[in-house]
Amino acid sequence: MQESWLGFEDGDNLFKITPTAIDINDTRALHVAELTRDALRNMGRYIAGASVLICGASYRQDVGDTRYSGSELVVRRLAEIGADMRVHDPYVAHWYEFEQQETYPAPGHSWSRFFRNQDDLVNLRVNKELPAALKGVEAVILAVPHSQYLNLKPAEIVKWAGNPVAVIDCFGILSDDVIRDYFKLGCEVKALGRGHIQRIKEEIRKAGS
């Protein structure tokens, strides 16, 4: 297999190399990574080198347990194609699946063995302060519907990031009105199971023309 994937600026070919060890139930996480890449592309940006914040490390809302978290695979896939990953979670202090990925949950059992470009993820640390975590990011993934994320205001997100961002909604957190506000601020929005978002985008575009 060629190693030229490192030269791909937006991960097109790499996304075709889905690790066969990943169960079909985990492909949802890989789709989130694709949506992130596509959202950034729509903004004229590349996933490689982009700063991406994943909001939610735990396996479900309002708990601090990272075991079996779908967010782990999202982070690993995005890191594989060159994204600079950050994480925020109000309930998680340490994400040991990354910090101790050589030995946790047991030596040789980490998901890291199925992905490339994983070495730097041992330095991934959970940020507890959302404004600080957002500073300078280009994409935000709402990966877990923690209470803190349910009423975030688009204007605040853009202010804290310092620029329009790509927003990926994994759990239907964003209402249509909030999505409209993101588009008005120059952001891009993608979501799982929300095919009508493109119509909202066109509606905003036509209203502003």
What does each model-identified segment do?
Residues 1-209:
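Structural/interface elements that position substrates and couple domains in central-metabolism enzymes
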